[in-house]
């Protein structure tokens, strides 16, 4: 049975600019058709707390708009831990690392329409990852830019029982600009203990005219593997595509797609279709139906290759684990 079909003792909460404490009946007292506090202002260099609540419970959905650029860094702390379990630019967390431009090469708003993340027209960023906590939850936003900015937000969840065996949600940001030519790009390493790898978003920026860029193979090393246990033959194959993301192999043109768990949803740059133009791509793969389980550790790499050999493109990723 789905959670919405089950009657339980869970208590819903929602933190927003209109209800910053998340208290029951703590929203606007202004009455119908009024806006008292639709946004929170975050000064340059300032960090504000968006959620601060005791557990046990679970974050269930997040919505942001307003300024959602790279200068905002989101952090999430579970159970009074000193270090964040989530730390990333807000744009990268929602799979849109090239936040200076939300319009794709065809002049349309690039929509990411997946089960876990929705990027909607008008810079509406939505997240549906479940994030459990046992003792405490704190979510902050830091403005690392030079200008004051405003953020619209609502973060919903519930206070509920959390099983002992449930994993904590983690998300980490990595970038390599450019990838060292001839070396694999590391998506994730240094993970220790028992858990699950549940997904990644990837932004790629082309740095050379070297035909198709998606020949790089994805390799997953489970526990103490010397060689990969899971090995995809190409970048497009790992992101559930094929043949260079082409809608016509003969004319070598790309076609975007956005599915429930995977996609290559945006292409930024000029509208010339051929593989060898210098463009930027946004991709995602969520392992909801097929999480990658590990007992003592996990590592994943992705080659940066084209048809004629290694490349030196810009790679940025945001990886998600539950452990």
What are these regions (language model features)?
Residues 43-68, 123-125, 129, 146-149, ...:
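Surface-exposed interaction/gating patches
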Residues 141-143:
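Asparagine-centered strand-capping/turn motif at beta-strand->loop junctions
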Residues 105-135, 263-295, 305:
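Beta-sandwich interaction modules
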Residues 1-117, 121:
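An N-terminus-focused feature that recognizes amino-terminal "leader" regions
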Residues 147-155, 310-318:
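Edge beta-strands of jelly-roll/beta-sandwich modules across compartments, strongly enriched
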Residues 320-323:
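Conserved small/polar residues in nucleotide/adenosyl-binding loops
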Residues 77-81, 86-87, 219-226, 303:
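Short strand-turn-strand beta-turns centered on an Asx-Gly dipeptide
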């Amino acid at each position: 049975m789905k959670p919405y079909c089950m009657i339980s003792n869970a208590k819903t909460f929602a933190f927003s600019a209109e209800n910053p404490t998340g208290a029951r009946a703590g929203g606007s007292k202004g009455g119908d058709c009024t806006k008292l506090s639709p946004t929170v202002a975050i000064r340059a260099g300032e960090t504000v707390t968006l959620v601060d609540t005791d557990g046990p419970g679970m974050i269930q959905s997040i919505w942001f708009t307003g300024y959602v650029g790279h200068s905002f860094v989101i952090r999430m702390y579970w159970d009074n831990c000193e270090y964040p379990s989530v730390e990333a630019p807000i744009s990268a967390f929602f799979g849109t690392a090239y936040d200076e431009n939300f319009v794709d090469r065809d002049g349309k708003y690039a929509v990411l329409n997946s089960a876990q993340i929705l990027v909607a027209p008008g810079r509406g960023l939505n997240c549906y990852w479940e994030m459990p906590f046992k003792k405490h939850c704190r979510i902050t936003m830091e403005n690392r830019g030079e200008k004051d900015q405003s953020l619209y937000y609502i973060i919903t969840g519930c206070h509920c029982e959390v099983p002992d065996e449930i994993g904590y949600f983690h998300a980490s940001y990595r970038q390599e600009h450019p990838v060292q030519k001839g070396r694999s790009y590391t998506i994730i390493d240094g993970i220790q203990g028992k858990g699950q790898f549940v997904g990644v978003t990837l932004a790629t920026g082309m740095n050379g005219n070297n035909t198709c860029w998606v020949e790089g193979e994805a390799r997953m090393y489970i526990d103490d593997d010397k060689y990969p246990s899971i090995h995809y033959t190409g970048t497009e194959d790992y992101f559930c595509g094929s043949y260079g993301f082409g809608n016509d192999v003969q004319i070598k043109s790309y076609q975007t797609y956005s599915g429930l768990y995977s996609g290559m949803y945006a292409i930024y740059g000029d509208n010339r279709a051929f593989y060898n133009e210098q463009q930027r791509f946004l991709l995602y793969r969520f392992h909801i139906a097929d999480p990658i389980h590990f007992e003592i550790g996990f590592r994943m790499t992705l080659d940066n290759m084209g048809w004629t050999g290694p490349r030196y493109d810009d790679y940025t990723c945001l990886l998600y684990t539950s452990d």
